[in-house]
Amino acid sequence: MRLQRHGWCAAGAILIAATWVVLCAAEAPKGSGELKPTYARTANGELEGVVSDDGKVRIFRGIPYAAPPVGALRWKPPQPAASWTGVRKAVEYGARCMQNRVYDDMVFRDNGPSEDCLYLNVWAPAMARQERLPVMVWIYGGGFVAGSTSEPRQEGENLSKKGVVVVSCNYRLDVFGFFSHPELAKESGRDAAGNYGLMDQVTALQWVRRNIAAFGGDPENVTIFGESAGSFSVSGLVASPLARGLFHRAIGESGAFFGTTLQLKPLAETGKADMEFARSSLGTASIEALRAKPADEILKASAKERMLRFSPNIDGYFLPQDVVTIYAEGRQNPVSLLAGWNADEGGYDAIFGQDPPTAQNFKAYASKLFGGNAEAFLRLYPAATDAEARRSAQDFSGDRFIAFPTWKWLEMQYQKGKSPVYRYRFDQTLPWAADYRPKPGEEPAAPHAAEIEYVFGMLSSRKLPWRSEDRRVSDLMQSYWTNFARTGNPNGQGLPHWPVYSSKDGYRVMHIDAASGALPDQHRARYLFLDSLPTSR
């Protein structure tokens, strides 16, 4: 089954495709052969990139930051990339990592999938050769099962024009990125397995620290930012001792390792399940035999598993403990945080399933799920009418999927961290394509992943009837994001004031849309209720 990631929502660990569709189209890659070459020397050798057609950005694509994780390196932490002599062309995206075709709204411009996929890209202002500009490292989303840096909406050229160096990196996914067989733990020397995709991200950050000065970037001013699984990754990197000192600020767009959406399990549990998968689906539990199998055979077997079957775990190495404990004890990395989510992260179908979306069915659902707490739940998610029940079901699915986990992350960083925290909600209503409109009353305002094109200034990557207000919102978000990367404060001249997240100010939230402004948190009671439930922890 292929899904629209924009239409995804979750109830607990189960993700269900919503009913509406967003039309997407790829922007054709620019003909790099017709553009002026540019050069940079890294620790591994010299690179030849291209200058953008307006002369403002230097672009380097497909830079190897680790050795290809193939053969004996399959399911091992990333190893150093080989150096080269001469000049290496860096004009095309590296292959995306092994993945099944899952999300129809993902459009790629690379020659993957392939196990040989650990490549990154750099966009640097052309005037930055001798400067030390802020660096922003992007981590894509896709449920840890899909994604690539070659998606048109994640092109870093326009964002770089705001005076930052933008980096994006591929990382291993699905069974190739998060397989935690017990034999892997034994051979690791650390009793750790899985989380190879997250260790790839750490290795990319190490590459940035060693090499980004060659592109005009400041290795002492690095911000990581990501969306969905990329935002989950950011919350994990903030918690991980392996990433300490590699970045200085963090931006999370819709997601964190809190709550039940993508619950981290201990290695002992995931290892047992993964060994059984190998034995039953691939016919062997031997790591040597599994490494000898074709990648396509392993990928095909993983496609038969439930969604998010292979995902990060508590391995004792990348994550010494669960993230809640790490944050609660104040042991996370001391970085500033800007995080939030979109107004409509979920869809009511995640709650009703095949049942009619009525008030009666929503109340029955509340009684079944919450028992004695159903009355309290319905005060926060009312269902006096069918229309109100649909809205509450959509709110609850979005809260449990994305809003609550991200809120909990913000709260814990605010309570236990040592640096400022900023919170937002993306409210900008997407324009609809002329040949498609949802049913009346069912149009989401700002669905999951809708902010990506705005953040990157890449509205042109999708065939939608964009309005002048969309372009203004995009410019606003780029300014906020890059200001935060530059100074740790998103505010700047001419921008609506964004207050720091604080109990003294009503936990104010920056609502980002055509009339952006900060308001006190209107839904704090909902998140506190969810936080009080044992299943939310």
Regions found by a protein language model. Give the residues of each.
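Hydrophobic h-region of N-terminal signal peptides that target proteins for export
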Residues: I16-C24
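Surface-exposed helix-capping loop/turn segments at secondary-structure junctions
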Residues: A124-L133, I212-N221, S281-S286, M412-Y422, ...
